[in-house]
C-alpha cells in the first residue's frame, strides 16, 4: 500500500513539474486592455512576427505555400513594428531593426518551445494559447 501511495505521489509531482505555464500574456488579453498604447502595438506586431516565423517553420514540409504566406507575414509584422518603434522612440532604421529583431528571435524561440511541448503532449504544435495568439495576428493581416 505504501508503494502504491508513493507511486501516486511521485506521479503527481512529476506531472506538476512537467507542465509549464504559457510563457506569454495572451495577445488577446494584452490588446484588449491596451488598444491605444503604441508600445503594446510594437510588442504585438513583434510577437505576431515571431509567431508567423514559427508557423512558417512547422508548415514548410507539408505545405510550402502556407509556409511562404507566414514568411511574408513575418516580414510585414516586423516591418510594421520597426516603423512604429522608429517613430515612437526617434531612432534610426538600423537601431530599430537591431532592437526588434533581437527580441523577435527570443520570442520565436519561446513559441518554438511552446509548440514543441504541445506536440509532445498532444500531437499538435498548436495548443489553445497559440491558436488564441494566431487569431489576434490574423485580425491584423487579412490574406
Show which residues each predicted segment covers.
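Repeat-mediated protein-protein interaction surfaces in helical alpha-solenoids
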Residues: 23-33
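Bacterial N-terminal signal peptides
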Residues: 6-15
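Sec/Tat signal peptide C-region and signal peptidase I cleavage site
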Residues: 16-23
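Short N-proximal segments of mature Sec-exported proteins
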Residues: 34-90
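Positively charged n-region of N-terminal signal peptides that target proteins for export
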Residues: 1-4
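Compact alpha-helical subdomains of small soluble proteins
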Residues: 74-143
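Generic signal for short, ordered secondary-structure residues
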Residues: 27-28, 60, 116
Amino acid at each position: 500500500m505504501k508503494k502504491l501511495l508513493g507511486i501516486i505521489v511521485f506521479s503527481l509531482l512529476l506531472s506538476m513539474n512537467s507542465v509549464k505555464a504559457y510563457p506569454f500574456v495572451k495577445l488577446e488579453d494584452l490588446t484588449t486592455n491596451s488598444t491605444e498604447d503604441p508600445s503594446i502595438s510594437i510588442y504585438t506586431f513583434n510577437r505576431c512576427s515571431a509567431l508567423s516565423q514559427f508557423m512558417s517553420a512547422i508548415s514548410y514540409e507539408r505545405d510550402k505555400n502556407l509556409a511562404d504566406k507566414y514568411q511574408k507575414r513575418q516580414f510585414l509584422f516586423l516591418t510594421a513594428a520597426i516603423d512604429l518603434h522608429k517613430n515612437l522612440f526617434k531612432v534610426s532604421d538600423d537601431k530599430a531593426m537591431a532592437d526588434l529583431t533581437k527580441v523577435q528571435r527570443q520570442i520565436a524561440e519561446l513559441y518554438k518551445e511552446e509548440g514543441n511541448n504541445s506536440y509532445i503532449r498532444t500531437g499538435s504544435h498548436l495548443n489553445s494559447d497559440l491558436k488564441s495568439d494566431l487569431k489576434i495576428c490574423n485580425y491584423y493581416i487579412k490574406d
